[in-house]
Amino acid sequence: ESFDAFLATFTAEKRKKAKRERRRVAEAGIEFDTLHGGDMDDARWDAVYPFYADTFYRHGHEPYLNLDFFKRLAASMPDRIMLKVARIGRTPIAVAIFFVGSDALFGRYWGAGGNYHSLHFETCYYQGIEYCIDKKLQRFEPGTQGEHKVPRGFVPTLMSSAHFVADPRFAAAIRDFAAREARGVDSYAAAVNEHVPYHRAPDEELQL
């Protein structure tokens, strides 16, 4: 299995678009390093954390997780955290932070120090897909929401969640809303499925 074999499952139009996006990143002189927790010393974390934090600052929020959290996580779970660091020459320009499960890759955080055409798609999606192929992981979950993920190979997958309602007076209203919301989500997922890029079902589904 290879990335080209994966792209071969796309329609010609979608395959051409994905290749064009990857080519634009390469033509900009951008290269990628794959780093796991054990590869990340303080200097590397200090270099890439501002990219993660800036994603929150741009929307008027404080970062959910501080730098010390990531350093501690990498030290305690070195094989479970993976970073794709984009760079031009020796200078980092963007990072995507992933978590590695026994059979799945989970994409969670991203940030960049500038605007580069298609860099988000390459760093967060295409690089992750290549990693899954190389490591023979069965699933890649890049995070919730985002119609832009669909033409890049991710199909909508319905997920469940459980919630505790402390005040029983809210239970009926919440139950009614959840039932109506479920019907809407089913309809939306069916509509999105009409736009997946595959000309045949992929061997392993990538989850949206």
Locate predicted features:
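A conserved beta-strand-loop-helix scaffold within acyl/acetyltransferase catalytic domains
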Residues: 1-118, 164, 179, 196-208
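Acyl-donor binding region in acyl/amide transferases
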Residues: 102-168, 175
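Short Fe-S-cluster ligation motifs
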Residues: 178-192
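C-terminal "cap" of GNAT-fold acetyltransferases
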Residues: 168-179, 195
